[in-house]
Amino acid sequence: MFVGHVNDMPKIDMTPGGAKGAAKQVAVGPEQGWEDYVMRIMTLDVEGNSPQHSHDWPHINYVISGTGVLMMAGKEYPLMAGTCAYVPANVEHCFTNTGSENLEFICIVPTRGEA
């Protein structure tokens, strides 16, 4: 069992991986008892983005706050609080903050997707 608060989770800078103005916090994963998946909280600063990329695992996203776009398989999808998305394995995608405040979203991946 595990209960935690986002304010107590360290922020990990994602810019060394090619992102701009991006950080993640690992909320729940194997260390908390969820063996097969990891729930991360991603934050994109104003004008921040993830790199255009793909990988061999899917992920599920839920937007907590802010606005942006998800470019997936050549199509642009608007993001706002309450938006959910499923990104299949091996599909090119990129998250971009287009708003005037941070874009925060949950990203759930299999454990092999958390590096």
Model regions and ranges:
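Conserved short histidine dyad/triad with adjacent acidic residue
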Residues: 25, 40-55, 89
